[in-house]
From Swiss-Prot:
CDD domains: GDC-P (cd00613). This is Probable glycine dehydrogenase (decarboxylating) subunit 1. The keyword Oxidoreductase applies. NCBIfam families: PRK00451.1 (NF001696). The glycine cleavage system is composed of four proteins: P, T, L and H. In this organism, the P 'protein' is a heterodimer of two subunits. It catalyses: N(6)-[(R)-lipoyl]-L-lysyl-[glycine-cleavage complex H protein] + glycine + H(+) = N(6)-[(R)-S(8)-aminomethyldihydrolipoyl]-L-lysyl-[glycine-cleavage complex H protein] + CO2. It comes from the Bacteria. Its EC number is 1.4.4.2. Signal peptide: none annotated.
């Protein structure tokens, strides 16, 4: 929109309406010593073409997966996004800043969310999914709070290696609510020790949390962890990578009470870290305890199918002391992207994408461990991420690989850990992986 300056008559009219004789009269309450008494040192005005050129020059200094080969992971993945997704979600019926406070008026939006919920339930093998949460980390924290609400217990135990940032968000949520700190069992060969977990989980534990695959990319023994939780009367919470469910068993199949996840890989761009999508699913018996929005299907007075927001347990809708959550929105557009993604790929497509990631990750790992000085840090099975022991500090590799147009992975020393976390998605080609391995051999 072009900038149209206020005219003298415009300013006079506004001052008169404000009951001020002059601009100085209008700001009389601002102390003289803090008023700006000189012009701002601004660059000269530019025309539109010059502004565009300058902004494009600044943007070109960014490094993104559009111009680099990415082996970054740790919760945000360089997945292929079919062009049909952008075409569908960019339609004006969906792509809007409007929040449907009279939700039932927006039947199309509600149906889209309903379809998302249905698809997520099928993917995770669970009974009920909500309309979405902010991201995977907040979904996990809300799951822990829900478990405490359901069981009346205070303790949360983490089995295996949770993403450090998710762990931090979890601790922030629980600490702010006055709950006990989270405790974690020991990690051996990349996965949680079942023996140490068994000694930590008792009748005082509200929930046992596991990330599958875990932060290191390794596969936890979810069957054993779930059994320990059930024996102690604790809820079993699984934070699952949605893409892994193309080849791994769904959380519902091995007894998860609550299953959450980060939905970014389902059609959302990495986009500087957000907005992302929090997946939240539960068993049917917990439906009245689920946080956030829930879309249901009903009949109108003429017998036609319709969609509504149902079981609204947010504090905006019911008494605060009765509310299950104070989440004030959801990620509807990202949820729509996930629904379109899942619909386009279908069961077979999800299996193919997950299978390609699995095969390529193991191909690359096998290539790298042949290079002197490199080895896998853990012997546990992995899906599409693995941790490397390296002959030089991972930070050196990461920095030098940038010069070659490659994001080499995550230097785990930023988390106080050791090794280089490498992720492989279906986008990586054999040529890219072979070149990466060749460059690693130069260190």
């Amino acid at each position: 929109m072009p900038f149209i300056i206020n005219t003298d008559s415009d300013r006079a009219e506004m001052l008169a309406a404000a009951g001020a004789a002059s601009f100085n009269d209008l700001i009389a309450d601002i102390p003289e010593e803090i008023r700006l008494k000189k012009s701002l040192d601004l660059a000269p005005a530019l025309d539109e073409m010059a502004v565009r050129r300058q902004l494009e020059s600044l943007a070109a200094r960014n490094r993104s997966t559009a111009g680099y080969v990415s082996f970054l992971g740790g919760g945000a993945y360089d997945q292929f996004i079919p062009s049909a997704i952008r075409a569908i979600v960019s339609r004006s019926e969906f792509y809007t800043a409007y929040t449907p406070y009279q939700a039932e008026v927006s039947q199309g939006t509600l149906q889209a969310i309903y379809e998302y919920q249905s698809l997520i339930c099928r993917l995770y093998g669970m009974d009920v999914a909500n309309a979405s949460m902010y991201d995977g980390a907040t979904a996990l924290a809300e799951a822990a709070l829900m478990a405490m609400n359901v069981t009346g217990k205070e303790r949360i135990v983490v089995a295996g290696q949770l993403h450090p940032w998710n762990s931090s968000v979890l601790s922030t949520y629980l600490g702010a609510a006055g709950h006990s700190p989270v405790v974690q069992n020991s990690v051996e060969e990349g996965v949680g020790s079942i023996a140490s977990l068994r000694g930590m989980v008792d009748g005082t534990v509200a929930a046992v949390i596991v990330q599958q695959p875990n932060f290191y990319g390794c596969l936890e023994d979810v069957e054993a962890i779930g059994a320990i939780a059930r024996e102690a009367g604790a809820l079993f919470i699984v934070s699952a990578d949605p893409h892994s469910l193309g080849v791994l068993e769904a959380p519902g199949a091995y007894g998860a009470d609550i299953a959450v996840g980060e939905g970014q890989p389902l059609g959302s761009a990495q986009s500087f870290g957000g907005p992302y999508l929090g997946i939240f699913t539960v068993r049917e018996k917990f439906v009245r305890k689920i946080p956030g929005r829930l879309v249901g299907m009903t009949k109108d007075r003429d017998g036609r199918d319709g969609f509504i927001l149902t079981l609204q347990t947010r504090e905006q809708h019911i008494r605060r002391e009765k509310a299950t959550s104070n989440i004030c929105t959801n990620q509807a557009l990202n949820a729509l992207q996930a629904a379109v993604y899942l619909s386009l790929l279908g069961r077979q497509g999800m299996q193919e994408v997950a299978g390609q990631s699995l095969e390529r990750a193991h191909y690359l790992a096998a290539r790298i461990v042949e290079i002197p000085g490199y080895s896998l840090r853990f012997s546990a099975p992995f899906f599409r991420e693995f941790v490397l022991n390296t002959p030089v500090h991972p930070a050196v590799i990461v920095e030098r690989m940038l010069e070659e147009g490659i994001f080499a992975g995550i230097d785990l020393s930023v988390f106080g850990d050791e090794g280089l976390l490498v992720s492989v998605t279906e986008k990586r080609t054999k040529e890219e992986m072979d070149r990466f391995a060749l460059l690693l051999s130069s260190f």
